[in-house]
Amino acid sequence: RKLYWPFIASPERPLTPLLFAYSPSVLPKPADWTAPNLHIPGYFFLDQPDYRPPQDLQDFLAEGQPPVCITFGSNIHQGAQQVTQAALAGLARTGNRGIFLTGWGGWRPESPPPGTLFLDSAPHDWLFPRCKTIVHHGGAGTTAAGLRSGLPNIVVPHATDQPFWARRVAAIAAGPQPIPIRQFSPERFVAALAEAEGENIQAGAAEIGRRIQAE
């Protein structure tokens, strides 16, 4: 049996399947991707069906309206405190509740304001559907989970591929135009929250959620 290593050019060598793990509903397959070994099967998820939420999270969700979830994943940003304070100000101005998943680079106040809850992390597949809007950095995995929830996504890209996915979210009407991390402010956050409540984005987010769930 031949291994054709390292990728020896041979007419006998079978084509290596190439899987692109994102949803074709988010980024359609390019017209020039005609090779039979190129596949876009949809997102891959690693759900946690056995997750049991801590009591403080259960209590917070039961106390009021679905919150805005704010998570920047494993990103470490020098302005984490300023960004968090801007998000808190935006929530206060709009009367929204909020859950902050602080991750590796998060900051939390010593005394969180009423209507907010700060956690290190929580499974996206469990938490996101219980929220109102998802605010995140645009990482591929968080974008996938946010879109699958069927809720509006407000993307605050930091670096690397995040601006690309942020633009795709807006292009499919699953969220407003992205807010680059260095431009994040209470005013821009308030405007994005208002836009996320509009009929167009609500419908777009729900539609992409249905498509991804069916893939």
What are these regions (language model features)?
Residues R1-P67, G73-R97, S111, A203, ...:
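Nucleotide-sugar-dependent glycosyltransferase catalytic domains
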Residues L19-A21, I40-P41, L119, V156, ...:
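Hydrophobic residues at beta-strand termini and immediately following loops
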Residues D56-L57, A122-P123, R188:
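Short acidic active-site motifs
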Residues T102-P123:
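Nucleotide-activated donor-binding/catalytic signature segment of Leloir-type glycosyltransferases, i.e.
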Residues L117, N153, I172-R182:
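A short acidic/histidine/glycine-rich donor-binding loop in glycosyltransferase catalytic cores
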Residues L119-R168:
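A donor-sugar binding/catalytic signature common to diverse glycosyltransferases
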Residues R182, P186-E215:
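C-terminal amphipathic helix plus adjacent low-complexity
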